Design a protein with these regions (language model features):
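Mid-to-C-terminal alpha-helical segments outside catalytic/metal-binding sites
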Residues: 2-9, 274-315
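Alpha-helical scaffold segments that flank or form the walls of functional sites
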Residues: 17-26, 34-89, 110-130
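Divalent metal-coordination and catalytic microenvironments
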Residues: 22, 64, 158, 217, ...
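Histidine/acidic-residue-rich catalytic or RNA/ligand-binding cores of hydrolases
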Residues: 29-33, 76, 175-181, 203-211, ...
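Short acidic/histidine-rich active-site segments
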Residues: 67, 166, 220-221, 245-269, ...
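Active-site gating/metal-coordination segments in enzymes
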Residues: 81-84, 89-161, 216, 222-226
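Catalytic pocket-lining loop regions of alpha/beta-barrel enzymes
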Residues: 159-242, 248-249
Length: 315
């Protein structure tokens, strides 16, 4: 039986169960944290995250994938603490966000990939917890020269280790299309890639174009009503299931118990359902009511995550 690394050690892929494939626990910039002691109160935020995950756990969630990149504030010790206290498996990430960090400019893709490979093969810091998925991102700047270097480094680490790739995209510039093209150029097996945030789009032709590459797509921002209302997100998934694509979709929120992008009270006001329990509590019943079969729900929530983490070995 294939295994996958988590914050609590390796588990059989059969034990992943219902899985939210694109989430975050704590996002907080490390430069700020190291210079301002009160930037984030981890002792407060860890129990808060545990409480939020416990609500999802009560509704059947067994595993989440934390996709916080290294340079977006990945906090492996908090991830471990939250996983242990909640009993929810957390699959941990490596990889870099789309932002142009000054230190990156003097290094090529091969050098950047060495850090990801180390996280996957040796473990993160001194924790012995190994990353099991590679995060990368393309945003409003698109796949420019710098971003292509990041995608190339991701591809190198993926092909060396076999760890799957999960991405951040924006629908405003159709960056998913350019990510697919770049990964194909770098020899990536697209069946081992999740192209993220495509649930922000209702353009079925565009989604089918991305799906035709053989990748998975993330319908993974449920609860972000400001980007797209839940009913429209649900209908898009319903339509794609009717077209036979359940085997290539994963469903999640891109939620975060704490993030330094916004004031917490503001988030609760503009996105009250942007939380780990929204999918099992509200979205899955809505999909069933919309005509999606229980078998297709199980495929998206259980079988597809298992498949993503079952493919092993570099190539």
């Amino acid at each position: 039986m294939p295994q996958v690394e988590t914050a609590m050690g390796s588990i059989d892929v059969d034990d992943i169960g219902m899985c939210l494939m694109h989430e975050h626990i704590i996002i907080a910039d490390w430069d700020m944290r190291q210079n301002y002691d009160d930037y984030v109160d981890v002792e407060k935020e860890v129990p808060k995250a545990v409480g939020s995950l416990n609500k999802a756990k009560e509704r059947g969630v067994k595993t989440i994938v934390d996709l916080t990149p290294v340079n977006l504030g990945r906090d492996i010790r908090s991830i471990i603490a939250v996983s242990k206290a909640s009993g929810v498996n957390v699959i941990c990430p490596t990889g870099f966000y789309w932002t142009e960090e000054a230190w990156m400019h003097g290094w090529d893709a091969n050098h950047l990939s060495t850090y990801m490979i180390r996280d996957i093969t040796e473990g993160i810091l001194d924790t012995n917890v190994k990353a099991a998925i590679i995060k990368c991102a393309t945003d409003h700047t698109g796949v420019d020269e710098f971003n292509k270097k990041l995608l190339h480094s991701t591809a190198i680490a993926h092909r060396e280790t076999g760890a799957p790739i999960s991405t951040h995209t924006t629908v405003a510039n159709s960056s998913a299309r350019d990510q697919v093209a770049a990964f194909k150029e770098f020899g990536v097996d697209m069946s081992r890639v999740v192209i993220g945030h495509l649930g922000d789009s209702t353009n079925i032709d565009y989604l089918e174009e991305i799906l035709s590459s053989g990748c998975f797509i993330g319908m993974d921002r449920f609860g972000l009503e400001a980007f797209l209302p839940t009913d429209e997100r649900v209908q898009t998934v319903v339509t794609l299931c009717e077209k036979g694509y359940a085997g290539q979709m994963v469903v999640s929120h891109d939620a975060c118990s704490f993030q330094d992008f916004f004031d917490g009270e503001y988030v609760e006001k503009f996105a009250p359902n942007w939380c780990y329990e929204h999918v099992p509590r509200d979205v899955l019943p809505a999909l069933l009511a919309g005509g999606v079969s229980q078998a297709d729900v199980d495929t998206m929530m259980v079988a597809n995550p298992k498949k993503i983490f079952s493919a092993k070995g570099g190539y």
